[in-house]
Design a protein with these regions (language model features):
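Acidic catalytic loop of the alpha/beta-hydrolase fold
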Residues: 171-176, 206-207
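Alpha/beta-hydrolase fold nucleophile elbow
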Residues: 112-123
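Alpha/beta-hydrolase active-site loop
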Residues: 91-111
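Catalytic histidine neighborhood in serine/cysteine hydrolases
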Residues: 188-207
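Short, surface-exposed "cap/lid" segments of acyl-processing enzymes
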Residues: 37-78
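Gly/Ala-rich beta-loop-alpha elbow adjacent to hydrolase catalytic centers
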Residues: 122-130
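N-terminal cap/lid segment of alpha/beta-hydrolase-fold proteins
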Residues: 1-39
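Short beta-strand/loop motif that positions the catalytic acidic residue
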Residues: 161, 166-169, 173
């Protein structure tokens, strides 16, 4: 875990800290963070889609995930991977981006040492990175991924998947084939002790255009049940 001096530009007196800078493995990482002051509040990291295809932490699906975790009582961080926005470095084919995400988790844990749980979330490329991080960090309690690119990247590393989670997919996704995601969800679901909630959003394309509210509803509903906060 990183020491507290790895975090820069932090104002601890405020609950809302929209801009943070983290010392990453390739230089500074730009992020946005909202802190929940409740003792033991869970923490979450949200990861964006492919850096070479316009993916940033301000992507609408990423922002929807971020706000859904915040609304569910999480202290939540989203970052720009290396070479995106004001984050330093350059695209590293997933390897460096995985290290960026690991550093962001270290930052979250350093700033929230009493957190009751930690979750990972991601959209598209960010889902692939997030699931790899899930395998490397046994402390993760759960995951939420949207449009995991199972037709583009190898997900066989999830053998076994260490945590239950939520997978959301549009049935009109022109980038990620729904059938490939359904197959991935089914494969993970067969593993002992896991519960994978696979939800299809009818009519949704890859970017869930005009359907972010539906994504948010699925996420907040799932988190309420998973964290025991449902009424």
């Amino acid at each position: 875990m990183n020491s507290p001096n790895r975090a820069l530009a932090i104002n601890r007196s405020k609950q809302e800290m929209p801009e943070v800078t983290i010392n990453g493995p390739a230089g500074r990482l730009e992020g946005r963070y909202t802190h929940n002051k409740a003792h033991g509040a869970p923490i979450a990291l949200v990861l964006h889609p492919h850096p070479l295809h316009g993916g940033t932490m301000n992507n609408r699906v990423v922002y929807t995930l971020f706000q859904s975790f915040v609304a569910s009582g999480f202290s939540t961080l989203r970052i720009n991977f290396r070479g995106v926005g004001r984050s330093q470095g350059k695209y590293d084919r997933g390897e460096g981006e995985l290290n960026d995400a690991a550093t962001a988790v270290d930052w979250l844990q350093t700033y929230n040492p009493q957190a009751s749980a930690i979750w990972i979330a991601g959209f598209s490329f960010g889902a692939w990175i997030g699931m790899q991080l899930l395998m490397r960090r046994p402390e993760f309690r759960g995951f939420v991924v949207v449009a995991p690119p199972a037709n583009m990247y190898d997900f066989t590393f999830l053998a076994p998947c260490p945590s239950s989670g939520l997978i959301i997919q549009g049935d009109r996704d022109e980038v990620v084939a729904e059938a490939s995601v359904a197959k991935l969800a089914e494969k993970i679901s067969k593993q002992r002790g896991l519960a994978i909630d696979y939800r299809i959003v009818p009519g949704a394309n890859h970017f869930f255009q005009d359907q972010q509210d539906i994504v948010s509803s699925h996420v907040t509903e799932y988190l309420a049940k998973a964290t025991g906060r449902s009424e």
